[in-house]
């Protein structure tokens, strides 16, 4: 609702952490968007995402959607990915299985064995900056990042192409389940240094996670 009050259309939207297309559906229904580049690191989640392509077209046939089974990060490298049975929690970050949040979450989701919560495999990671250069993008009207504790790394991987971003939306987890090597202050300082200002903040239901919107 906040975005709809202030924006009607976006030419280029980049969706990092597509999962199974929740952001694509939400934005296609509520905004005119010329093109969406949607990234999902997990090959398992990506297969589910691909199956919804026809549905996306029905929602808004005027929006071109590019789906990429690609992991993004701060460097071009290979990293271990944790594919959760509850797929929206999949992440590159280490997990504290002894944390209260982990135990509470998987008890509610009927995961009786902590060891079965996720399995691991390696994924190739590249910087978003490289993709932007490859596609010759000259503007990014809206960048959404939801990567379960890996948001800061995505931002660092933009390099100087962060100057192309007009509006940024991301989630930040304050719970102790995801072991991060940064704090919200690190992200906030980084964005301020790149001429962004926070314009919106909202707590997500039933969890210690906030959604933020910044604009330059």
Where do the PLM segments sit?
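Phosphate/nucleotide-binding beta-alpha loop and adjacent structural elements of enzyme active sites
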Residues: 1-216
